[in-house]
């Protein structure tokens, strides 16, 4: 491999119909990938995708701070999602981490950029800090 993309999300809903093909295109272009989970479901999906490839596909598992509280998010352009509140379940993530190609645990730290207008920002910050 010539390159490695250290932060992909081919495990998300936008790629549900072509995740394997998307990963294969990267591999064909000599790009290894680390596919990053943002909550338990997408972390499971990142790990499940590993079994479809022999090498050069890895996973990081974790809980993104924007999933520590329930909300709808839209950036006005292309990103739009609805999320439920989730707490970091150490046992569940520990189990996923047993796969030999899980190379990281954690998403990206605290995220105060995507705070909903209609929620108490301090309350959300407390929820995020508690998860990490």
Where are these regions (language model features)?
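Mid-domain alpha/beta scaffold segments of enzyme catalytic cores
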Residues: 1-132
């Amino acid at each position: 491999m010539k390159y490695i993309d250290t932060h992909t999300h081919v495990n998300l809903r936008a790629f549900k119909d072509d995740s394997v093909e998307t990963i294969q295109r990267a591999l064909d272009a000599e790009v290894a990938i680390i596919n990053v989970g943002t909550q338990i479901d997408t972390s499971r999906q990142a790990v499940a995708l590993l079994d479809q490839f022999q090498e050069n596909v890895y996973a990081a598992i974790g809980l993104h701070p924007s999933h520590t509280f329930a909300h709808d998010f839209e950036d006005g352009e292309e990103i739009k999602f609805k999320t439920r509140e989730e707490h970091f379940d150490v046992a569940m993530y520990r189990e996923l981490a047993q796969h030999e190609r899980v190379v990281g645990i954690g998403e990206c730290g605290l995220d105060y950029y995507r705070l909903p207008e209609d929620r108490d920002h301090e309350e959300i910050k407390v929820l995020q800090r508690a998860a990490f």
